[in-house]
Amino acid sequence: MAAAALLLGLALLAPRAAGAGMGACYDGAGRPQRCLPVFENAAFGRLAQASHTCGSPPEDFCPHVGAAGAGAHCQRCDAADPQRHHNASYLTDFHSQDESTWWQSPSMAFGVQYPTSVNITLRLGKAYEITYVRLKFHTSRPESFAIYKRSRADGPWEPYQFYSASCQKTYGRPEGQYLRPGEDERVAFCTSEFSDISPLSGGNVAFSTLEGRPSAYNFEESPGLQEWVTSTELLISLDRLNTFGDDIFKDPKVLQSYYYAVSDFSVGGRCKCNGHASECGPDVAGQLACRCQHNTTGTDCERCLPFFQDRPWARGTAEAAHECLPCNCSGRSEECTFDRELFRSTGHGGRCHHCRDHTAGPHCERCQENFYHWDPRMPCQPCDCQSAGSLHLQCDDTGTCACKPTVTGWKCDRCLPGFHSLSEGGCRPCTCNPAGSLDTCDPRSGRCPCKENVEGNLCDRCRPGTFNLQPHNPAGCSSCFCYGHSKVCASTAQFQVHHILSDFHQGAEGWWARSVGGSEHPPQWSPNGVLLSPEDEEELTAPEKFLGDQRFSYGQPLILTFRVPPGDSPLPVQLRLEGTGLALSLRHSSLSGPQDAGHPREVELRFHLQETSEDVAPPLPPFHFQRLLANLTSLRLRVSPGPSPAGPVFLTEVRLTSARPGLSPPASWVEICSCPTGYTGQFCESCAPGYKREMPQGGPYASCVPCTCNQHGTCDPNTGICVCSHHTEGPSCERCLPGFYGNPFAGQADDCQPCPCPGQSACTTIPESREVVCTHCPPGQRGRRCEVCDDGFFGDPLGLFGHPQPCHQCQCSGNVDPNAVGNCDPLSGHCLRCLHNTTGDHCEHCQEGFYGSALAPRPADKCMPCSCHPQGSVSEQMPCDPVTGQCSCLPHVTARDCSRCYPGFFDLQPGRGCRSCKCHPLGSQEDQCHPKTGQCTCRPGVTGQACDRCQLGFFGFSIKGCRACRCSPLGAASAQCHENGTCVCRPGFEGYKCDRCHDNFFLTADGTHCQQCPSCYALVKEEAAKLKARLTLTEGWLQGSDCGSPWGPLDILLGEAPRGDVYQGHHLLPGAREAFLEQMMSLEGAVKAAREQLQRLNKGARCAQAGSQKTCTQLADLEAVLESSEEEILHAAAILASLEIPQEGPSQPTKWSHLATEARALARSHRDTATKIAATAWRALLASNTSYALLWNLLEGRVALETQRDLEDRYQEVQAAQKALRTAVAEVLPEAESVLATVQQVGADTAPYLALLASPGALPQKSRAEDLGLKAKALEKTVASWQHMATEAARTLQTAAQATLRQTEPLTKLHQEARAALTQASSSVQAATVTVMGARTLLADLEGMKLQFPRPKDQAALQRKADSVSDRLLADTRKKTKQAERMLGNAAPLSSSAKKKGREAEVLAKDSAKLAKALLRERKQAHRRASRLTSQTQATLQQASQQVLASEARRQELEEAERVGAGLSEMEQQIRESRISLEKDIETLSELLARLGSLDTHQAPAQALNETQWALERLRLQLGSPGSLQRKLSLLEQESQQQELQIQGFESDLAEIRADKQNLEAILHSLPENCASWQ
């Protein structure tokens, strides 16, 4: 049965036409026919896939007896063994009955049994039309298995056939199902036909795809069956094994005998190509595909090629090949698609796309819409019909469009003549004004072509600067004349037409003829007119009525009427006009008259007096043409040479059209001008009141400018000279009369006020402060109101510093430069700039370091320099006596300049003086020595620098000198003898002079030496020696006894022995006295130096200028103590000098020695006290200077940062000064110790001899010494007391300085917060700019005054005034800047409301007090801080200056600041609301004011303000925008202005203080460099 079904499928799929070649798609005639690929086993060689295959792992299987391959033993399946594997490749390999191979699944022992299925999948690579599927089993066939297929590669699995003995149970399908005709034939059947267990081997299962399908015999017409047989993949699902039922015992041998095994898997069918291909093969991608014919494409030739869409695609059948036909696109496209509707209606379904050449239609057979072509072979062209002018956009075959009425053109793109503005409604008619247009309107825009002076779309109005639109005017409108001052004019109704006429009825009427040579003569006149002779080339000159102002003839005709012979042509006549330096010629522009050839005729020649006329030479602009007519000086007619006329030619009439005042007929060409400001008159020919000609007497053509009389008078409109009033003068009333002051530029009657100066002398006003300053004070006076004395004068005219004192000329003894400035003090008259080395209130003394007469008439005889010798003078004292010139010399130094030593002294050394020669009183002839070497003049035989020893070969040092030794040259060992005159003898010689031989010695024969006598003489010599020794012993005993000789042995008294050693002690006491006096003088010098240092401290503390009272009192007391000490020392020195010291004194200590010891102790204590006083005073001076500098800076009103910095610098200076004092004490201490050692040495030397004072003869001296000791003790106590006071004063000053430094702590915080206050300076920029302009004007006036007073002294005075004014302007600028800080202080720091309160209070406090720089961060804390700082400032200012404002005013101002601080809380809410809107503005302000903060104080204010003016203007525009912010700023500015008014009084006082301070600084700078300075 399976074989029968298989044969049926093959028969149905085979071609019906016998003999038709299935491989050819075209027959022998080239006609298409169906073609099919070969029928094949599609499974052969293709690799099938099995889900389960035995051998992995290897296993044993036991075939049933009777099965193929069954034997006695079981076999083994091993996938790794090529001989024993049974993989899926054996399904589709070559099948042989003899050598069978098979695929085998695992046995039941491995779980292969229902419901576990084993699947075999076969992929065909493309769609095949399957005829049958055959399976040959190596074992028994399965009890249940199924065949599935896929119609397309990505399609679902579809059931193909089910085989099962339990169809319903296993697959849910009935067994033995069949189909009726009309039912869906794509249904899988289930059958039990092949489900028996027998045969055990080699059973076949053949499935025919068309078996049981009713339409199988009509396969070509059944798409369902065609799709049913189509498959791309096949799947065999082996679901249940057939068993004998012995598997239930699970015997392994039994289970190993049940498994699936297939030896062959065959699929019969053809490659599906739908009848359009005869073969299949791999494509470029290696995939199996049909090689399509019949213009088809696709893997299965399932569609037509893109351009072969003329009919629908269809399978090729035996009856028809259904070849795809190409589309008909008329050669204008290569793309088309199949359109079923088009095919249904036309039989051709190919619809072309993307037709070229602007064609359209299914076959590109016609032009697109709005395109055309005149030849079907040509491309279509666009119609381009104008949409607005065409009835529709489609044109005919010629491209001509159908136009709307009033529209023309091939494309209906233009209007007909007389129409314009093509639109959807067609064209509109032109409405050009014929008087102003030249032709019809532009057909596109409708704009009319206007004449030169006409404008508008319709040419219906004159251009600006013209008027009187007239048809006969070639330019349309006439140009406005208005004397060049206006371009706006119109026709006036106040003038009528007027004709200037010459008809020659009564003669030539003033016309003259001029020949070529230039001579004038009356023309030839007859009743017919004036005879013209063209051959003579004469000119006719018009009379006066045609000349002059003929502006009203501009643009009007000048008509000449001639009487000419019949048939003659018009004469070539030229018209020449001259006037105002201009000239031009015109030719006639028209000809009129009857053309009667038989009679003489009248001919009119018309000339238009306008620049647009033809043949105008040279061409002139309209204004110049009218200017020529305004002053026409000559009008001449000239007949050019030409053909001789047939008869006489007469000029019968000349008519010039003009105008004159009247109403009818109106002369519309006369203008009335609309004059700009400053002009008046119908033609703007006059200057309006208050205006003048820019060029005096310039006439109506000159421009008018405003009178520059500053509202103080009127000016002549032609000359411009002002007639001034209101006490003003000048060409422009720009200054007040002498004796008046004010700002005449304000334009008010009371601008100039009488000067409040003596005798109403001249004055001026500072522009910003409005301060009146007198400029011509009486001789000897100066100042803003002449309130101070002029340079070189002194006094107090207004009694500002006491009783009024008139100004007197300073008396400086002729020792000042009369041309210098600041020679004397303006109040006291004390001279400040003394010359010729003079000083004093009136330069009546010589300066320190100079001597002579300061009042000498000749400068050479005045003060001369001391020129003290630097080595011999005392540098600490005054250089010299101011009268004698005697310098203060060091000890033992003399001469006026201390250039040499006293007699008896030598070796001049700096700081020490001269040393004593110390010439020996016995050995020297005098007590003087050489001033350089110190060599004394010795007595005979004496040598040594001090003549204190005998020369070699001399002895007997005495008052007479030394005597010669006269030692025997033969017997003496040397020329020098002993002090007793005995010589040193050679052996064998003896005697004082060694001039004899010893006893028992004799002189040799040669006389060279002494020879010993024989030995017998020795005994005698020994005995004589014994006797001599006893004599010597006796002699010694006699010398040791007191025999009334106080000085020595008798031989000394007799002059037999030296006397130097004996007499030397007689001079010890006088030498000690001199040394002691020298030390006393040194002590006196030290006291003087201390006094001078105290005086310098006194000056440094400004005790002469109301300095610190406590400090100055202590310094005065110290000076009194030093003065008393000096007096005591001088008294003691005088007593010591007057004492008579005896030649000898007691050897025991006396009371005098004790007093001397006490004096040394007192001197030491005095020296130490003086050192401490100097150190304390120096510290007091530094502390005072520091405090004074601090107070002075506060008085000047410097900012907190500068105050803090200065105080810190001063504190460092105090510490540096203390360190310097310690260094100075360390340097002075060795010198003091040296002095003390000297005093001690002197005391030790004199102590033995001072004991003589205990004798009765010394009682007066001892009494004096006791008094001196008592005074010294009192001096010590006084010095100790004042030392204590000085220490306390220094401690007090040190405490005050530390307290002052502690006051800077709030100023440090002020410095941090004051930087933000600089952001409040912008709103005063404009006012400051005006200030600078005023300052420049005033300085220019001062420079002018400088030219009037060329003397140097006057120049200096003017320069001082200019400096004062500049300083005031700068102060005023600072004031305005601070006012701006206050104005912006309410708006700028909006970023922080709490910080805003502090900054606002800081501005008020700084501008009010100039001393308290603390900020009001919070109202209460700021108030307490300001009060504390103000109280400290008040206490300090009372000691530093009498010009500080009263504390009551500061208290009121601080209360005002407190009230302002209270008002800040009310503004806090408004500030918070405005914060967001001003954030960007704050950034701009911060950048701007950062530059202001870094501004150099010496930079001109104008320069700085000009640099920032543009940024401030931009910010002002932003802040000036309307809104709530502007209103709030206005309120803040009003409040700031109120505060400004309250502070102005205090600022005025501060300005006065600054002025006084500047005067003091000027005095300070004028002092010589060696004068005392308190800075």
From Swiss-Prot:
One of its GO terms (biological process) is astrocyte development. Keywords: Basement membrane, Cell adhesion, Coiled coil, Disease variant, Disulfide bond, Extracellular matrix, Glycoprotein, Laminin EGF-like domain, Repeat, Secreted, Signal. Residues 1378-1399 are annotated as: Disordered. Residues 1014-1575 are annotated as: Domain II and I. It comes from the Eukaryota. Residues 499-672 form the Laminin IV type A domain. Broadly expressed in: skin, heart, lung, and the reproductive tracts. Residues 271-326, 327-382, 383-429, 430-479, 480-489, 673-706, 707-754, 755-809, 810-865, 866-916, 917-964, 965-1013 form the Laminin EGF-like domain. Its main location: secreted. Disulfide bonds join C271-C280, C273-C290, C292-C301, C304-C324, C327-C336, C329-C352, C355-C364, C367-C380, C383-C395, C385-C401, C403-C412, C415-C427, C430-C441, C432-C448, C450-C459, C462-C477, C707-C715, C709-C722, C724-C733, C736-C752, C755-C763, C757-C774, C777-C786, C789-C807, C810-C824, C812-C831, C834-C843, C846-C863, C866-C880, C868-C887, C889-C898, C901-C914, C917-C929, C919-C936, C938-C947, C950-C962, C965-C977, C967-C983, C985-C994, C997-C1010. SMART domains: EGF (SM00181), EGF_Lam (SM00180), LamB (SM00281), LamNT (SM00136). Residues 1-19 form the signal peptide. One of its GO terms (molecular function) is structural molecule activity. Residues 1073-1134, 1201-1228, 1410-1492, 1523-1567 form a coiled coil. Glycans are attached at N87, N119, N295, N328, N631, N837, N980, N1185. Residues 31-270 form the Laminin N-terminal domain. Laminin is a complex glycoprotein, consisting of three different polypeptide chains (alpha, beta, gamma), which are bound to each other by disulfide bonds into a cross-shaped molecule comprising one long and three short arms with globules at each end. Gamma-3 is a subunit of laminin-12 (laminin-213), laminin-14 (laminin-423) and laminin-15 (laminin-523). Binding to cells via a high affinity receptor, laminin is thought to mediate the attachment, migration and organization of cells into tissues during embryonic development by interacting with other extracellular matrix components. The alpha-helical domains I and II are thought to interact with other laminin chains to form a coiled coil structure. This is Laminin subunit gamma-3. It comes from Homo sapiens. The lineage of its organism: Eukaryota, Metazoa, Chordata, Craniata, Vertebrata. The gene is LAMC3.
